[in-house]
Structures are given as C-alpha cells and as structure tokens.
C-alpha cells in the first residue's frame, strides 16, 4: 500500500474527470463568445474607418443639387451683400491683371473701354465664384450631418469600442517597460512632436477648407506653433500621473529616452 489510499486516489481521479468534462464545454463556449465579440468589434472598427468616406460621398451628391437650387433662387440681403463685396474684390484683382496684360501687349484701346475678352473673363469669374460658394456650403452641410451621424454611431457602439481598447491595453501592458517607453515616444513624436509641423499645417488647412474658412497663413502658423506644444505638455503630464503609480520605471525610461 502506498501512503495515500486507493479510494482517495480514485475519488480524486473521478472528480478531476467530472470537472474536466464540465469545464470543457464551458471553455468552448467562452472561446466562441470571445470569437463573436472579436468579429463584431473588428467589423465595427472597419465600418468606423470606411463610413466617413461613404457618408461624405453620398451626402455631397444628394445635398449639392439642393444647395445649387437654393443659391440660384434665394435673394437674401446678407448673401447678396457678401456676394457683391467678394465679386468687387475679384473684379479688382482681374482688372489689375488685365492692366498688366495691356502694358505688356500694348493694346491700342483705352483702359476705360472694356473689350469682349475682358467681359468674358469677368463673367467666368462670377461663375467660378458662385461655384465656389455652392461648394463651400455643400461641404458645411455635409460635415455637420456627417459629424452627427458618426457621433451617433460611436455612442451606439461603445461596447464594441471598449472590447477593442481592451485588446490595445492588454497588448501594451504585455510589453516591457523599454518597449512601452519607445512606443509612447514614437507616437508623440509622430503626432505632436517637433517632427510634425507640416502635418499639422495640412490638417488645419484641410479643416479650414472643409468648413469654409479662408486660408490664412498667420492663423495657421500661430496654431501650429502653440497647439502641438499644449498637447505635448498635457500628454507628458498624463504619462506622469498615470504611469508613475503603475510603473515608475517606465516614467524614468521615458524621460531618459526623451532627453
């Protein structure tokens, strides 16, 4: 006889077999649930990446005819005033260009008598101006409606986003402190570091064009010189507050690599 009675060994073996037989389906069920959640989360993320382009194209094609009809039939005083002011400015620029052409080509006509070429150019300027206005208004409506739809889609899919972010957190925390610091430093330098002023210029210029703002180099330069600095300071403070309690060595490595 051994030190442990055979009855106890048989009992433990029976319990182990029963436990494994019960836990097997449970494990498969949990794996199946995790697989379905992962598939739903990936589909949601793919839709979230593709949806803005689809919404923009569909809304633009459906809204532009309405905006064109509204622009051609409406006669609001404010819009007429703005149209008149902008058209006069454009006319002034065209007149300067035409005067320069006259000086070069030595036209025999006097400047006070406009030629058919000048009238045609001014007519084209008016058409281009109206086309630009319709384009800007269409973009405004498209962006606001698209933003509302995407916000609703994000609110409805918070659980799926939470699953995706849990994967990212799990992957991030599974790395070593050196790799964590390297990943954080790479992301900050690419997005808000001193290596990305041109990217910020393109982003701000794209936003201003989509929302109908006039391109202004001074405003863009001031935003590029201040906004990334503020974001960088906030991000460093967040790293210090969050990771100083979880992993102080990560904060030390990050500051050493950043220097």
Curated annotation (Swiss-Prot):
Q: What does this protein do?
A: Contributes to K(+)/H(+) antiport activity by supporting proton efflux to control proton extrusion and homeostasis in chloroplasts in a light-dependent manner to modulate photosynthesis. Prevents excessive induction of non-photochemical quenching (NPQ) under continuous-light conditions. Indirectly promotes efficient inorganic carbon uptake into chloroplasts.
The UniProt record lists the keyword Disulfide bond: no
Membrane topology term reads: Multi-pass membrane protein
- Please tell me the species this chain comes from: Welwitschia mirabilis (Tree tumbo)
Taken from the record, one Pfam family name reads: CemA
Q: Which residues cross the membrane?
A: 47-67, 136-156, 184-204, 219-239
The UniProt family comment states: Belongs to the CemA family.
Q: Where in the cell is it found?
A: Plastid, Chloroplast inner membrane
The signal peptide stretch is none
Q: Which reaction does it catalyse?
A: K(+)(in) + H(+)(out) = K(+)(out) + H(+)(in)
Molecular function (GO) terms for this protein are:
antiporter activity; proton transmembrane transporter activity
Q: Which UniProt keywords apply?
A: Antiport, Chloroplast, Hydrogen ion transport, Ion transport, Membrane, Plastid, Plastid inner membrane, Potassium, Potassium transport, Transmembrane, Transmembrane helix, Transport
Task: State what protein this is by name.
Answer: Potassium/proton antiporter CemA
